[in-house]
């Protein structure tokens, strides 16, 4: 089964508290979501492989390290996942960005895919799905399934807050996918919101209702 990791770095926890507050405005919310995304991917990528390369500094020749192995693609689940992308790209500017568009039926809470766009070599890349919320796990599982259907083999999931029910759903449906969260919250409410959560991340990012 894939591992579930809470990235409890003090800066991540501090910034998460700010965006949880109901009086945090759109601009600050948007900025900090991006910052947390960058901090999370920094922690998540500690196991990326390195290789030796010969370079020449202004002083002379030297053997140094650079990234090896599979290239990365960041996959936000639209629309809320977009808020995490800029922070991730500040850490990994060379990463490609794919997009999966989904909406959730407010009655059934079931996700529906309406858009999918990826780099052509998706099967050769490591995919990091980003989405602020892991609630029921429905959207995450659909996104993972859509990537696997197109040939992706290496997938990780990064979320800001996760409900235990969502973590369980993803682990059962996709035991080969590792999940990373800034925090695991208490529970999933009957209306599909995470408690205590941070509200509707998409609306708070873009100033909509």
Curated annotation (Swiss-Prot):
Details of cofactor binding: Binds 1 Mg(2+) ion per subunit. The magnesium is bound as Mg-PRPP.
A molecular function GO annotation: GTP binding
The protein's enzyme class: transferase
Cofactor (UniProt): Mg(2+)
Binding site for uracil: 194, 199-201
Catalysed reactions, semicolon-separated: UMP + diphosphate = 5-phospho-alpha-D-ribose 1-diphosphate + uracil
UniProt cross-references to SUPFAM superfamilies, sorted A to Z: PRTase-like
Gene3D superfamilies: 3.40.50.2020
EC number(s) per entry: 2.4.2.9
Pathway it works in: Pyrimidine metabolism; UMP biosynthesis via salvage pathway; UMP from uracil: step 1/1
Assigned keywords, A-Z: Allosteric enzyme, Glycosyltransferase, GTP-binding, Magnesium, Nucleotide-binding, Transferase
Record carries keyword GTP-binding: yes
Gene Ontology biological-process entries: UMP salvage; uracil salvage
Residues the record lists as binding 5-phospho-alpha-D-ribose 1-diphosphate: 79, 104, 131-139, 200
Pfam families: UPRTase
Regulation: Allosterically activated by GTP.
NCBIfam families: PRK00129.1, upp
Family: Belongs to the UPRTase family.
Annotated protein name in UniProt: Uracil phosphoribosyltransferase
Organism: Lactobacillus gasseri (strain ATCC 33323 / DSM 20243 / BCRC 14619 / CIP 102991 / JCM 1131 / KCTC 3163 / NCIMB 11718 / NCTC 13722 / AM63)
Gene it is expressed from: upp
């Amino acid at each position: 089964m894939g591992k579930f990791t809470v990235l409890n770095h003090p800066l991540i926890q501090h910034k998460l508290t700010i965006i949880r507050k109901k009086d945090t405005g759109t601009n600050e919310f948007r900025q900090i979501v991006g910052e947390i995304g960058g901090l999370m991917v920094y922690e998540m990528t500690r196991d990326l492989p390195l290789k030796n390369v010969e370079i020449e500094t202004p002083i002379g020749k030297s053997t140094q390290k650079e990234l090896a192995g599979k290239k990365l693609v960041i996959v936000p689940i639209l629309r809320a996942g977009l808020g995490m992308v800029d922070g991730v790209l500040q850490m990994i500017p060379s990463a490609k960005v794919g997009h999966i568009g989904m909406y959730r039926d407010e009655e059934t809470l079931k996700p529906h895919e309406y858009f999918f766009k990826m780099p052509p070599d998706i099967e050769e890349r490591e995919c990091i799905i980003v989405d602020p919320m892991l609630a029921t796990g429905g959207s995450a599982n659909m996104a993972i399934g859509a990537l696997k259907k197109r040939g992706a083999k290496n997938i990780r999931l990064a979320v800001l807050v996760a409900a235990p029910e969502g973590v369980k759903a993803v682990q059962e449906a996709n035991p080969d996918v590792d999940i990373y969260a800034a925090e695991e919250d208490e529970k999933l409410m009957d209306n599909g919101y995470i408690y205590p959560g941070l509200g509707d991340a998409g609306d708070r990012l873009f100033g909509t209702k």
